[in-house]
């Protein structure tokens, strides 16, 4: 669908309105003045429309930019983009303010005062600023490239930033996901091999557990907001039943059949009880559990798998009446105990079943604050709705049909999150819903992530460690946590680290304003010898620690490639600049092209252009970028689009915005339809490698707080916050607002007007007991049971019945 069109606006009313708007946004430019200066003569104004994508939100919704004389005056949703189908959230509409924000960084800046205090900067040319950054980077690269750190907040063109840039430099990199959803990602990679958290198959699901999903006001796994809500509404229209598990009702009320107001941080206990009930009531998909999980693997009294001479796990084959390798078994036993060679072995499923024996609904009710009857009811309904043994045909492919699903995402970020997510996944595994039609999904396509294999062979090394503490006795499963890195930077010897980064390149990230424990962040960032910041504004981090600030464009740039898939159809989008970059800002890819050229790693084998070719999959094709000539960003995307056989190359996106390939085939969506099924991964009920890692951590002297949750089966323990003094008698949770995205929206006036400040949601009974009324200012103080520290913040009270009385 072509959406670009041009026309002339004639007539004084239309022209006058546009002139007024133009003056408001852009000032009183000479183009509006009469040649003699004796009165304004409205000129014909050119209106056109440019397809692009949202710059602020997570999921890159399609947008149509309305322009007057080349300047954007309005954004609307792109009706042809599968992700948002013509709709936009408040962020999409309001980001026009970000483009014209007078507080944007207008030129490159160089600090003129000491760091650690409010910054003073002078304007610089791009040549001077880039030369300074390149010199500092090369000074350190000459000794050790890993001592250059590239850190991102939100990366919108992973190929060019996360991959090509860091590989060309050989530098370290650090993301923000440890504050977002990485716990869920790591748990799913470990358990079923998928790089995602949890979402349902909305086209076919009949029963959904909405587990901490902020229905109607936030995103979920993979998507930001609009896509899931539209799919939810369609599913509800055909009868989808929803169970909402959350201490706060949120906006889920009209879309929920049962609300379980769980005590914060006790999701693991509930998931264990659901597993216990499913097994007790016989809701088991035995063929799936026997064939595609490690449930039949034999476990010795030491907790380790029985293995043959080649190291392969053994199962008890009832056909052979003996132990054989898992892949060779004709009839593997899922349950039972077996005496082999004088030693007793239980199947992993048998170990799991016995492990769950005491995790009853009555036990979970005491822990979670829910009713035992409701817990048993959800387990019963989940098992019934799974329709174990049934099949359906989708696009000509017969698949197991298990129309029960789970949606979860940010709730994974809790103290027991890794094991909670594993247990929640096991709820779906028991009924065979993982990768089935209507069942549990985790990514858009069924592709086993490299971490699945790596996590099955966890390394726990002796120091010295690198500054992320990867493969250390502290964090064998490591996602690169900025908060931990900051603590290591401040005191590397404490963690057995000998070298810390000296130069940081911060890409759209604001650790001081966006991450927790500001004091620790400041202590860490003080250790960098040089900091370069790429972004449109002076953030708190740039203010205190940037040596150089490079002004990035907002939406006015080429960026991508971007997925436009809704999980049902396959589509690709590209961010197309709806106007030229304002001031002296540049698109990030332009910045990196210039920077790597200055550093000396743009050309040749292994250089930036070579890495771009590799990351885009073009290296061996006729469309590969030449390694001896500097392209424009548009030329790069034109080569890529032609490589992808998109008609017209990049011009297609400039005219259409999105390329819709078609419906995703079942072989990509469903694990059962993949070749081989589930990508060859054997799903882990029993985590032997977690046990081995725990033993190694203990041997190397790690404290209990580090190793206590490396258990082969999800195991409940009281969260550490229960050790706070009794005066701290409420639980504190956070939630997302659709009006804001991280800290990049806090300076957009339209969004600040819609959601001007945080509030404290509190149950009326709790508020009354404390003498708190609607709108009262209150202090909220929290206590760290590990360090004994307290932090407090002032906010205002909002009374709501949709909140547990012991939770705010």
Residues covered by each model-derived region:
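N-terminal export/assembly segments and adjacent metallocofactor-ligating motifs
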Residues: 1-287, 291-333, 344, 362, ...
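Long, contiguous, secondary-structure-rich segments that constitute the structural scaffold
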Residues: 14, 18, 578, 588-643, ...
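Glycine-rich phosphate/diphosphate-binding loops that line cofactor/substrate pockets in enzymes
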Residues: 129-148, 198-208, 355, 378-405, ...
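Gly/Ser/Thr-rich loops at beta-strand to alpha-helix junctions
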Residues: 152-160, 215-216, 411-414, 510-513, ...
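A glycine-rich phosphate-binding loop feature that marks nucleotide/adenosyl-phosphate handling sites
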Residues: 154, 291-294, 381-382, 408-410, ...
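Extended redox/cofactor-interaction regions of prokaryotic respiratory oxidoreductases
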Residues: 162-240, 244, 269, 331, ...
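Flexible glycine/proline-rich, aromatic-decorated loop/lid segments
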Residues: 251, 540-574
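Phosphate/diphosphate-binding loops
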Residues: 528-530, 537, 576-596
């Amino acid at each position: 669908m072509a959406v670009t069109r041009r026309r002339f606006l004639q007539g004084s009313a239309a022209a006058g309105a546009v002139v007024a708007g133009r003056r408001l946004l852009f000032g009183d430019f000479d183009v509006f003045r009469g040649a003699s200066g004796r009165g304004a003569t409205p000129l014909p104004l050119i209106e056109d429309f440019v397809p692009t994508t949202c710059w602020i939100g997570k999921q890159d919704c399609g947008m149509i930019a309305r322009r007057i004389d080349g300047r954007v005056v309005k954004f609307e949703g792109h009706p042809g983009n599968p992700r948002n189908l013509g709709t936009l959230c408040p962020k999409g509409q309001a980001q026009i303010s970000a483009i014209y924000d007078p507080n944007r960084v207008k030129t490159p800046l160089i600090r003129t005062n000491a760091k650690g205090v409010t910054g003073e900067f002078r304007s610089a040319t791009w040549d001077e600023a880039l030369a300074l950054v390149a010199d500092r980077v090369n000074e350190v690269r000459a000794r050790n490239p890993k001592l250059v750190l590239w850190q991102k907040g939100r990366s919108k063109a992973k190929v060019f930033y996360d991959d090509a840039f860091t590989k060309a430099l050989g530098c370290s990199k650090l993301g923000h996901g440890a504050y977002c959803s990485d716990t869920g990602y790591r748990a799913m990679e470990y358990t079923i091999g998928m790089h995602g958290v949890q979402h349902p198959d909305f086209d076919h699901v009949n029963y959904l557990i909405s587990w901490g999903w902020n229905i109607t006001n936030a995103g979920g796994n993979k998507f930001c907001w609009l896509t899931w809500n539209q799919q939810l509404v369609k599913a509800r229209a055909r009868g989808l039943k929803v169970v909402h598990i959350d201490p706060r009702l949120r906006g889920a009320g009209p879309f929920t059949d049962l609300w379980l107001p769980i005590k914060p941080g006790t999701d693991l206990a509930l998931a264990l009880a659901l597993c216990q009930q499913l097994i007790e009531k016989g809701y088991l998909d035995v063929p799936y559990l026997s064939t595609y999980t490690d449930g039949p693997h034999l476990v010795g009294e030491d907790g380790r798998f029985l293995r043959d001479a080649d190291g392969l796990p053994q199962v008890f084959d009832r056909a052979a009446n003996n132990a054989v390798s898992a892949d060779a078994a004709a009839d593997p036993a899922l349950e039972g105990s077996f005496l082999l060679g004088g030693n007793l072995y239980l199947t992993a499923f048998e170990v799991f079943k016995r492990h769950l024996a005491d995790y009853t609904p009555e036990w979970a009710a005491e822990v979670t604050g829910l009713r035992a009857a409701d817990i048993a009811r959800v387990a019963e309904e989940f098992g019934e709705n799974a329709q174990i043994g049934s099949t359906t045909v989708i696009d000509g492919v017969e698949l197991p049909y298990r129309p029960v699903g789970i949606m979860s995402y940010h709730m994974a970020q809790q103290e027991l999150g890794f094991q909670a997510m594993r247990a929640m996944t096991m709820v779906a595994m028991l009924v065979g819903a993982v990768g089935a039609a209507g069942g549990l999904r985790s990514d858009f396509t069924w592709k086993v992530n490299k971490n699945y294999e790596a996590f099955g062979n966890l390394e726990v090394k002796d120091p010295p460690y690198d500054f992320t503490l990867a493969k250390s006795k502290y964090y064998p499963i490591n996602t690169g946590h900025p908060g931990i890195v900051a603590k290591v930077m401040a005191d590397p010897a404490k963690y057995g680290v000998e070298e810390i980064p000296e130069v940081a390149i911060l890409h759209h990230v604001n650790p001081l304003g966006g991450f927790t424990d500001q004091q620790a962040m400041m202590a860490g960032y003080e250790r960098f010898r040089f900091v370069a910041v790429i972004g449109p504004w002076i953030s708190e981090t740039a203010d205190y620690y940037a040596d150089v600030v490079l002004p990035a464009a907002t939406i006015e740039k080429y960026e991508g490639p971007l997925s436009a898939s809704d999980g049902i159809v396959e589509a690709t989008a590209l961010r197309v600049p709806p106007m030229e970059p304002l001031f002296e800002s540049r698109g990030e890819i332009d910045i990196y092209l210039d920077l790597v050229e200055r550093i000396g790693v743009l050309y040749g084998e292994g250089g930036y252009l070579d890495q771009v070719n590799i990351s885009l999959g073009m290296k061996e094709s006729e469309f590969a970028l030449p390694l001896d000539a500097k392209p424009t960003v548009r030329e790069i995307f034109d080569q890529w689009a032609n490589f992808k056989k998109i008609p017209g190359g990049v011009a297609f996106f400039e005219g259409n915005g999105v390329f819709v390939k078609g419906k995703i085939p079942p072989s990509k969506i469903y694990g059962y339809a993949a070749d081989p099924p589930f990508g060859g991964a054997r799903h882990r009920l029993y985590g032997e490698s977690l046990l081995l890692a725990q033993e190694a951590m203990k041997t190397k002297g790690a404290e209990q707080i580090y190793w206590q949750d490396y258990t082969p089966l999800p195991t409940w323990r009281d969260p550490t916050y229960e050790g706070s003094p009794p005066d701290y008698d409420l639980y504190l949770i956070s939630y997302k607002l659709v009006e804001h995205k991280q800290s990049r929206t806090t300076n957009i006036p339209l969004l600040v007007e819609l959601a001007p400040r945080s509030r404290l949601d509190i149950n009326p009974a709790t508020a009354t007991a404390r003498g708190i009324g609607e709108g009262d200012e209150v202090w909220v103080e929290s206590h760290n049971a590990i360090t004994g520290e307290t932090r407090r913040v002032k906010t205002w009270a909002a009374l709501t019945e949709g909140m547990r009385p012991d939770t705010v």
